[in-house]
Each structure stands twice: as structure tokens, then as C-alpha cells.
Amino acid sequence: MEFPHSVLLVVLIIATFAISNLVQAEEDQEGFISLDCGLPPNEVSPYIEPFTGLRFSSDSSFIQSGKIGKVDKSFEATTLKSYMTLRYFPDGKRNCYNLIVKQGKTYMIRATALYGNYDGLNISPKFDLYIGANFWTTLDAGEYLSGVVEEVNYIPRSNSLDVCLVKTDTSTPFLSLLELRPLDNDSYLTGSGSLKTFRRYYLSNSESVIAYPEDVKDRIWEPTFDSEWKQIWTTLKPNNSNGYLVPKNVLMTAAIPANDSAPFRFTEELDSPTDELYVYLHFSEVQSLQANESREFDILWSGEVAYEAFIPEYLNITTIQTNTPVTCPGGKCNLELKRTKNSTHPPLINAIEFYTVVNFPQLETNETDVVAIKDIKATYELNRITWQGDPCVPQKFIWEGLDCNSKDALTLPRITSLNLSSTGLTGNIAAGIQNLTHLDKLDLSNNNLTGGVPEFLASMKSLSFINLSKNNLNGSIPQALLKREKDGLKLSVDEQIRCFPGSCVITKKKFPVMIVALVSSAVVVILVVLVLIFVFKKKKPSNLEDLPPSSNTPRENITSTSISDTSIETKRKRFSYSEVMEMTKNLQRPLGEGGFGVVYHGDINGSSQQVAVKLLSQSSTQGYKEFKAEVELLLRVHHINLVSLVGYCDERDHLALIYEYMSNKDLKHHLSGKHGGSVLKWNTRLQIAVDAALGLEYLHIGCRPSMVHRDVKSTNILLDDQFTAKMADFGLSRSFQLGDESQVSTVVAGTPGYLDPEYYRTGRLAEMSDVYSFGIVLLEIITNQRVIDPAREKSHITEWTAFMLNRGDITRIMDPNLQGDYNSRSVWRALELAMMCANPSSEKRPSMSQVVIELKECIRSENKTQGMDSHSSFEQSMSFDTKAVPSAR
């Protein structure tokens, strides 16, 4: 975007200068970030820009590098205060601003560069802009004397956002303004990618640019007009209350064709003929039509009808947008509004926005690693020019002294090596190092570090090499770290802090005698306590330890293994067998039967709290010790997407687990359609998938120690009365063997069809085994096919899906019960994700965190389609994609 330099100041005065507006404007900037780049330290910050009412702050707190410049005096008379200064970056390849934002919130990011011949060289600086690790755009700052503005809508993946300037040739990058504006998350939605502003017009013969405070989102609306048009307007304020909040004075004017019987035509040239566009058309009737008058027209894109018989509402906004990105043949976009036979008035339009799609595929470094390395940077006050932006990516900008790895495009990069040798470090070894959980090599040698060698180094299991030599460390090396060294860790330290057994001299005084005496006394006390405990236990035979074991439980598995009664949590959730019989009304209502036993419906004390009681079958082969361990484990697992354990029964030969009751049964039940229920809609299926993925993500990274489900399948995804999905049987599958499948290895557990082939082959269990099984479930959700069907040519669901994908026909892959009611982009995205999860190689599968992110993007894409009600007076949707069947990607 570009604005004419000679009229910039006058335009903004005409469009925005009103005292009442400025007072209101100062109150309406919540969430705004407005940085005046290069504002001198001796000037007031923040300050109010007198002509716009925007509150600007110095950028000095948001970047560690750069120098201050000022535009040539010839520009001062017609330049706003915020454009007078700039920050330029003669040093380093990449220089980055770091901003605090809200993860998942949509922001409009705007970068403005007014060269103003600040360096007296009269050149055209050209450089790249990056958001985080991803290329955003190339900014040619000398192309327009008036300055260049670049905007993009972006959703941060963390609470920290980097905007980077990257040198691409001999010219020096610089920036005049950097601004962030929060947007509503339900506006400007895409199936994938972000929206880069290409043009934003309001159709008027005015010369005024409309911006803040008229536009509360601080979008910049340029006027445009053509000799083939005629302007009409109203003095009344229209209703602009849809998600886009187009300024009211934008909607007070409209353009119609100069010839009433002719179509209205609008053309736009793209920068590249391959660009994909999202188009937003804003309409509001500005004339009060009589009962016998009408304004009705068709909307055509590139000669094809995209919307028929549209009628704008009087003084009420309607936004029509593309559901999917569109292209322009030869790079020339043609919009045509053609009146219908029923219309007495020509078509009109008030405003139009064009956005090109820009993709940000590179994942940023794991947030835990980023926080840790920034903590280390702050601890040692490191000011390396390369230590800006993302630590690991892009690879060409990796921070000096770091090595990182990333398995594939769906795996977050991790820091694996930190080399701060000979960098003048002082103080203690930084505690933040322990948070680099994938660190393999650590080199802090040849510095001035003091203090002791920290214990946490021994607990960093990924470390294979540590060099702490040539420092001023004192004390001794922790014994745990010495043990790690014996086990293969390469440890380099100065000799004065090494203390091998037998090498440390101890003064021979009376201390050894005292130590022997103390140890002897302690031994006597311990023996006495043990005897008393033994006697006490003999007098209390009613304890759980001394009850008869269940018929199939070896005695050695019971001794001293009862669930700890010292935990209040455990006591509160323990039920007697008589209470179990009471809550189930003597096992009156069975809900189902699995490999572990029968599940019964129940309620606690006749209350409204319904429960599902799983009684351990006498034929089950698990041991009491495993049952105890699972109960202790399940009692500490709490997540909204995991079926919660209400309590348990542990009495003689009666073992039971009591779960919350899930009234809508399981996912498989609803997909099968055999029980007369309604068909699950596509967006409901996606939400169920997200819920289940969140539950698994919690097991993998939210639990300590982490857990692997081992039996992810559609029957283990239960649904409550609100159709919130919760994973079930996420603990017992580790400890129990299936009674009906005793031939399955005691090492490998799971359900045929869902079982990770790599886990089955190697016996090595990891979180990626759950990811594979989840991929199979996702394919079930998409296709409603049986996981294994011998009647099919391709019996396994992954083989069948791959076969159908090669034929490129998505309608034959999708569940026919959906009857085509879905957004094809969200389907393709979900399908690709499912196939990645079900990849035979675990290294090529995404993590559950990545699965959650991708599924949420699918939901955003689908909701964007479903949320645009065709009967709404505020917003209607339009699809320029006229193909009924998408081609294979």
C-alpha cells in the first residue's frame, strides 16, 4: 500500500481532525501497540499524535539494536510527527522487534517505512520483513516518496511476537512505524494462511483517507473513483454492527454506474498473476426506496455469477466475502455488478477489500526453549547482534553458539547445543539451562563463572557433553553427575573441583568416632521402630494387607501394597463393596462389557451424580499391585477431556473403578448410525477430534511422568450430554491384559487396526504410538469406514484412503451421511493430518500438540463457512469456487 506524500497531512486533517473524536480516540486504543521508531530518548514517550489521536511510544524498549535517523528537512512540513524519525540497522543480517501479544488472538500488523532521504544518499532501500521465522514481504522503501505501508493479519502461536528486518543487499533496512491492532477472531477468516492487505478502498470521489478514529480498528481506507461511475450518498449514519465494523462514513457514500442500465465494473491488477485472493464486498443502501422501487443485482467474478439477486439493506451493512481464495486470470481481477430484470435502480457498492494469501509454514522454536534461552541471555546480559528473533529458524539466522534440530515440518525445533565458551560470562551457572530439556552439548568453558556445579546438570538426561573447564568454580562435583560420567557422559572440569573417592584429604580428629556413634544410635532406633510396627500390625488383622486375596491374585503381589491411606484424596474416593452394590442397585443396569469386566450404571447415594462402575472380571489376568498403581495414577489425572475417576473399591476379592457417567456413549456408537441417532455434523466431528486430541496431549506433556494411552480408538472416546469428548481407559490399558486376547504379547498392548505397526514390531512404546492410533480414529471420523474390512480390496482404512486419494475424488472418501455438508478445505486439511498421524514411521508423525493446532485450524476454516448465515441481515457469504468436487492436492 502507498499513500501520496504531498497530501498525507492534509488528507488526515480532513478525515480525522475533530476534538471530540480525539478525546474518544484516546479511550478506544485498548490492545493497540503503536511504536514510533527512532523516537529520541529526550522526547516525551508516550505522546498523542495531534492529528490522529493515536498514542505512540518509543520503540527503544522493544529492540536491542539499531540507530536513530531523521527525515530530511524538506519532508518536515508535510509529515506527521510519528513519521519524522526512524530506526535504521547498519549492523547484522537480521534485527528483530519483540512484542508481547496474546496467543491465538488475531492482529493486524502494520509496518511503515518513510525513507525521507534520512541518510542523504537518495537511494531506494530494499529489504525483507519476517514475522517470527517466516518471510512476510519484501519492502521497497524508495519506490514511493510518500512511504510504504505493509499490513498482514496474523495469529501468534505464542505470547511473544518477533517482527524482523532482514538485509538482502547493500542497502540498510529501516522502519518508521510498527503498529499492532487487535481484530475480532471471527472476522477475516481463512481456510489456511494469513491475509496480507493488497487494497482497501471506499468508493468515493473524495480525496480523504479514512483511518482512526473513524475506523476503530485503525484500518486505512483509500478513496477510489472512475469516470464510468456516479456517486450517491446519505447524511444519515448507517448501522455498521457486523464483525467487520466498517466505518460509518465509508458506508455513507456509494458508487453506481454512470449509465443506469449498464453494469457496474471494477478492475484491479495484481502484483503477481499467481496470487490467491480473499475479497470482501461491503454494501449499504444509501437511498430510501419507495415500495414500488427496488435495487437488485447479480455479483459476477471473472465473468461467472457468484451471487444472485442480491438486495442491499437500507442503512444496514451487508458484507459478502469469498469462502475460499480466488484467482484472477492473467493477474487482472474483474468484478461486475449487473442489475436484474426486477430492479428499478442500478447496482451500488460502498467499499471493497482485497487480501492476498501469504503462508507461514515454518514452525517456530519450542516455546519452552525460547523462554529458557532468553532467560540465559538476560542472566549473562548477552548482547550479541545475532541473538534476536527465533533462536533456531530460519536455519540461516540461527543464533551464534546454538545448534538445533527438527524432525520435519510438523515438529517444533529444539535447542540441542549451547556453546558460550570464551564469552566473558560471570556469576553462577544460569539456572535457565535446566529448562533446555533437549540439550545434548553444553560448553561454558574459558569464562569467569563462580559458585558450585549445580545439581540440575545431573538430571538433564539428554546431555552427553559438558565442558566447564577454565572457570573459577568451587566446591565439588555432585555425586549424581560423577555417576553420569561413569555411565558415558563426557565431563570436562578443572581438577580443583574434582573429588574422586579417596582423593580428598580429611583431617584425622575425633570426627570419625562421633560419626560411628551417631550411626550406631540411629540403627538401634530404626530397629526398635520396626519391631513396634510389626507388633502393632499383628494386633490389627482387619487391615487391607491381611484380607484374603482375590482368587486370581498371587499372595506376593498383595503384601505391603495396599493403596496408601495417608492421602486424604484417596480416602475420600474409596468405596466399600456394599456401597458399590447400593449405587448400582445390585448391578441392575449393565452398560457394556470389555476385556476388564462389565460396566454398570449407578448413582452415588441416590443423588443426581451418575457414575459408570467397572467391576474387575474374575477372569482378568491383572495383579493387585497393578490395580493399586493405576488407582494412585488415575487419582492425580485431571483434565476436561479425560473421563474422571470418581472413586474405586478395593475390598477383599472385589475390585472396581468408578468413573463419571457419559450419557452420549462413545464416538463409534454415533458414527455407526445403527441406533437411530442423528448424524454427527462435520464441525461437530472436528470438535470431538479436538477434544480427544487435547486429552491425549495432556497425557503426553501435561502429566509427570507422562503417560501413553496405548488403546486409542473410537469406542474409547466417550461423549457427555453436551457432546464434549473425553478419552476413557487411558490408564488401565497399561496395567491390564485383555482377557479375551491372552495370546497378545504382555509387552505390546492395543486393538488390532489401531495398533502402531512400529510399536508392534519393536515393542518400544512412545507417545507417537498414540498419534498413530489417533490418526486411525480421525480417518474413521472422516470416512465412517470400518478400520479393518476384509470385504474391501484394501482391507485397512489407511490403505483404502490412500487408494481413494490417488483417484482424487473426495466425495467417495467422505462419509456419505454428511451429504456434502462440509468445507472442502477443512476436509483436505483434516485428511492430510490423519494420513500424517498414521504414517508407518513414527519420526514422520506430528506431536499431539501439533495435531491440536492443525485441528483447530480446520475448525476455524469450517466455522467460517458455517457461521455465515445466508439469511442474516448483517453478513452473507459467497463462494467464488464453483467446482462441486475438489481436485486432489
Curated annotation (Swiss-Prot):
Glycosylated residue positions: 185, 239, 259, 292, 316, 342, 366, 419, 435, 448, 467, 474
Keywords, sorted A to Z: ATP-binding, Cell membrane, Glycoprotein, Kinase, Leucine-rich repeat, Membrane, Nucleotide-binding, Phosphoprotein, Receptor, Repeat, Serine/threonine-protein kinase, Signal, Transferase, Transmembrane, Transmembrane helix
Locations listed in the record: Cell membrane
Keyword Transferase attached: yes
Major location (coarse): membrane
UniProt cross-references to Pfam families, sorted A to Z: LRR_8 (PF13855), Malectin_like (PF12819), PK_Tyr_Ser-Thr (PF07714)
CDD domains linked to this entry: STKc_IRAK (cd14066)
Cytoplasmic compartment segments: 536-889
The enzyme's E.C. designation: 2.7.11.1
Transmembrane domains' residue ranges: 515-535
GO annotations of cellular component type: plasma membrane
Residue positions of the active site: 711 (proton acceptor)
Modified residues (Phosphothreonine): 746, 751
Modified residues (Phosphoserine): 745
Residues carrying Phosphotyrosine: 659, 759
Biased composition (Polar residues): 864-880
Main EC class the enzyme belongs to: transferase
Span list, region Disordered: 544-566, 863-889
Extracellular side: 26-514
Gene Ontology molecular functions: ATP binding; protein serine kinase activity; protein serine/threonine kinase activity
Similarity field: Belongs to the protein kinase superfamily. Ser/Thr protein kinase family.
Protein name, UniProt field: Putative receptor-like protein kinase At3g46340
Organism of derivation: Arabidopsis thaliana
